[in-house]
Amino acid sequence: MQPDRNLLADLDHIFVDRSLGAVQVPQLLRDAGFRLTTMREHYGETQAQSVSDHKWIAMTAECGWIGFHKDANIRRNAVERRTVLDTGARLFCVPRADILAEQVAARYIASLAAIARAARFPGPFIYTVHPSKIVRVL
């Protein structure tokens, strides 16, 4: 299933956290037409391994980007949650650490219309991305 190119054209740039990996998920999303930057591309190989979540969250908000990640604890961690709230970050999380890269990418691709609708609004927010829906959790 190929995503709607008009929706992709209107979607803000996406930052892909290291929790999604640096190769497979980003490549699958790029192949589908998503415009994105990985943590490794933005920070460099060495620094990408140690950048704290609150720093990349703040950076995405400052850049006006959307964050894609797989760390469901961000909404529960006090510092990270506060960063989302204070910066107006817009995050979309696949809340399962045990699924394959193809399944992760498929969720984002299948949810493109819902993600695009949600991303039209200012943050702060976190949505979880499920096989057939997204759910606002913050």
UniProtKB/Swiss-Prot annotation:
Per the UniProt record, which EC number(s) apply here?
3.1.-.-
Is Nuclease found in the keyword set?
A: yes
Keyword Membrane recorded? no
EC class: hydrolase
Question: One Pfam family name from the record?
Answer: PIN_10
Q: Which UniProt keywords apply?
A: Hydrolase, Nuclease, Toxin-antitoxin system
Q: Name one GO molecular function term.
A: nuclease activity
What task does this protein carry out?
A: Toxic component of a type II toxin-antitoxin (TA) system. An RNase. The cognate antitoxin is VapB45.
> What is the protein name stated in its UniProt record?
Putative ribonuclease VapC45
Q: Name its species.
A: Mycobacterium tuberculosis (strain ATCC 25618 / H37Rv)
List the lineage, top down. Answer: Bacteria, Bacillati, Actinomycetota, Actinomycetes, Mycobacteriales
